[in-house]
């Protein structure tokens, strides 16, 4: 008994003590006033869950009406946002069509410029003293066939210093 925890002893004293008759009746313990030499018998309390009758039906109706309200709100929000997005989608389609035309022109100019780059020295459009830093740089300074047009188309519609050809060169 000396090795028991003090809180366990306190609880045992409160339940088994002389002033705990009311507590024993509330908890459901059997009053055990027995003499010396006999064993005490305690019955542990039983906790029973009880169901409330009548309120359950109203609670499920409240939940059901809340779910209907939530579904209606979501549906109306989706309908409004779909009609609002229609203008944005039309704007994106128009911009995509414009970009496609510009990109087709760029693709055609780049293929011609790639052909010209292969033969710039042979055609004489990019000679030695002028092409010291490369024909790309020469095309920015003076007109080189196909390459200058390719650079101009590549930078069309963009900020002058944000163009891919102008990373290290400022006009």
Curated annotation (Swiss-Prot):
GO MF term (any one) = protein domain specific binding
Residues bearing the modification N-acetylglycine: 87
Name the predominant localization.
Answer: plastid
Organelle transit peptide residues: 1-49, 50-86
The lineage's top-level taxon is Eukaryota
- Organism lineage string: Eukaryota, Viridiplantae, Streptophyta, Embryophyta, Tracheophyta
Quaternary structure and partners: Interacts with GRF5, GRF7, GRF9 and GRF10. The transit peptide is the site of PSAN that associates with 14-3-3.
Q: Which protein, by its recorded name, is this?
A: Photosystem I reaction center subunit N, chloroplastic
Q: Which InterPro entries match?
A: PSAN, PSAN_sf
Give the CC-aspect GO terms: chloroplast thylakoid membrane; photosystem I
The GO biological-process annotations, alphabetized, read as: photosynthesis
Write down a Pfam family by its short name: PsaN
Q: What does this protein do?
A: May function in mediating the binding of the antenna complexes to the PSI reaction center and core antenna. Plays an important role in docking plastocyanin to the PSI complex. Does not bind pigments.
What are the disulfide bonds?
none
What membrane topology is given? Peripheral membrane protein
Its localization reads:
Plastid, Chloroplast thylakoid membrane
Q: Which family does it belong to?
A: Belongs to the psaN family.
Q: Which UniProt keywords apply?
A: Acetylation, Chloroplast, Membrane, Photosynthesis, Photosystem I, Plastid, Thylakoid, Transit peptide
Q: What else is known?
A: The N-terminal Edman sequence is 2 amino acids down-stream of the N-acetylated terminal peptide identified by mass spectrometry. This suggests an additional processing.
